């Protein structure tokens, strides 16, 4: 994107016909366009279908643009997404989705047009209001340049993810256990053999909200063990207000954090977040100006909010 002028025009629309809902949005910029359309159909109570089509030209650009897609920005992507949700029995819910996408232009780690698929299945069991258990499986296939070929050889990579989570929230106390497993397989250039890398993690989090004092405390601990960066794992944590924090880890080590929030009254809020990552497979962390001598990395975040109300 270059020049001394810029514009971006957009329009959104919605149409409802019985149990069918059509929602869409279109935008055009100085050089490209972006289209997103969604069809949602409610078959019966507890049963629904969702179809999403997206078409983002490779030369479309917008300020702070965010939309549905495989990439992080509405740019250089076409795709169809189909999802279905069903609740055939009491306390049970099933969800399945399939995303077929393509990139008409080159992008990070791929020097030509490419395509891929992303499928997911999740089964959720909730026998009572404060207890939930779910099992999630996800499969993704993409294409990537083979290292050392200068972008002349492109082969597929396969990513399998499995997650099991148990959540118990009896009143002011909540407890959540999560186990993740990753398997990354890449086809090598010689003989088309597969190279497999694995990773797993176990995360335990607990939270408590005091009834007689405006204080909420949560702690979380994670152990991770992965073969390399491709088999890295993600562990979401509570962060500051209006922010999301989902760090990634690879190698072997522990991650623990504490989150304390105090709402003094309707006007003042004070929040402290402390976290530390301790690696067991290295003596230094990072490189260059971010190099840390040692195997531990500590982060501290403090937020103070003042709300003005009439």
Positions of PLM-derived features:
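Exposed, low-structure sequence patches enriched in small/polar residues
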Residues: 2-310
